[in-house]
Amino acid sequence: MKEIKLNSDSLEIYEKSVSEKLNRNDFIKLWDLDLNDLLDISYNLKKLFNKEKIDLCSIMNAKSGICPENCIFCSQSKHNTSKIDTYGLKSKEEILKNAKSVEKYSNRFSIVVSGKTVTDLEFEKIIESIEEIQNKTKLRVCVSLGLLNKDKLKALKERNVRIHNNLETSENYFKNICTSHDYSEKIKVILEAKKIGLEMCSGGIFGMGETIEDRVDLFLDLKKLGVDSVALNLLNPIYGTKIYEKIKSGDISPINSTDALKSICIARIALPNKVIRLCGGREHVLKDMQKYSLLALDGLMIGNYLTTNGQNIQSDLKMIEEMGFER
């Protein structure tokens, strides 16, 4: 990438971001800036802290559907009526095969399961899969296993695994998307994981009817929690989910590409030294503007998502190369 010079106002924001002198109101006011200015600031922050690289990760839906939780955005919730494949925990052979299929492209591989948490037997089998991947590939392993207790977190720490647990949105807005568990339960797990010394990935979803204030509050919570990686998703409303109906009826407006890019940039400015990763929904929301998100990002999730298809991996690799970034 060529050097992008900042105008005086943008330079001031950049410098205050680096020195952590921006407050909640400052982040909210960024929404009124021109998108190009936000992208310029974001790229300079990315270059300062995380250079010109785009880290790639992949996930596998290792246990799908019949989730007892009532998240209105999730096609795997039994409270929604989306038509998806449902199955129990995949075998370690199937999980290893999936990991090997993306090893050529990806640096990280995450085992994701549906449900509020995992049983002891499921956890034992997942540990076996983790060890298989670590022994037979060069991939770094992540897991998204719901609300885990201290013993399970310690077992994952012993195996140098990164934990993923999305906050999804702000504490204030969370009750609008889920009532079967609450925000504080997620915070408790993240704090316990950090206390044990686990690497932590957390983030949220844009486009569920939340305000820019909610998004900023999410970023500030992630900052306070000291997460290592921030996973950002853009809502791709799936037929059969409660949120699909809310968007169809006009109760919630779908997020557009400009709003999505601005939100990604504000995340970068609020969390300048964290790994910012864009995951699900980017193809649906950003379309041909995806490439501009790379100016603010350190990572992309590639391949398929939990119950929806992702962009062709070769297209992602070409996009990264054309924007002048390395992987």
Curated annotation (Swiss-Prot):
SUPFAM superfamilies: Radical SAM enzymes. GO terms for molecular function: 2 iron, 2 sulfur cluster binding; 4 iron, 4 sulfur cluster binding; biotin synthase activity; iron ion binding. Disulfide bonds: none annotated. It catalyses: (4R,5S)-dethiobiotin + (sulfur carrier)-SH + 2 reduced [2Fe-2S]-[ferredoxin] + 2 S-adenosyl-L-methionine = (sulfur carrier)-H + biotin + 2 5'-deoxyadenosine + 2 L-methionine + 2 oxidized [2Fe-2S]-[ferredoxin]. Keywords: 2Fe-2S, 4Fe-4S, Biotin biosynthesis, Iron, Iron-sulfur, Metal-binding, S-adenosyl-L-methionine, Transferase. Its cofactor is [4Fe-4S] cluster; [2Fe-2S] cluster. It is an enzyme of class 2 (transferase). [2Fe-2S] cluster binds at residues 110, 142, 201, 277. Residues 49-282 form the Radical SAM core domain. Coiled coil: none annotated. Pathway: Cofactor biosynthesis; biotin biosynthesis; biotin from 7,8-diaminononanoate: step 2/2. GO terms for biological process: biotin biosynthetic process. Binds 1 [4Fe-4S] cluster. The cluster is coordinated with 3 cysteines and an exchangeable S-adenosyl-L-methionine. Pfam families: BATS, Radical_SAM. [4Fe-4S] cluster binds at residues 67, 71, 74. Its EC number is 2.8.1.6. Homodimer. Belongs to the radical SAM superfamily. Biotin synthase family. Catalyzes the conversion of dethiobiotin (DTB) to biotin by the insertion of a sulfur atom into dethiobiotin via a radical-based mechanism. HAMAP family: BioB (MF_01694). This is Biotin synthase. It comes from Methanococcus maripaludis (strain DSM 14266 / JCM 13030 / NBRC 101832 / S2 / LL). The gene is bioB.
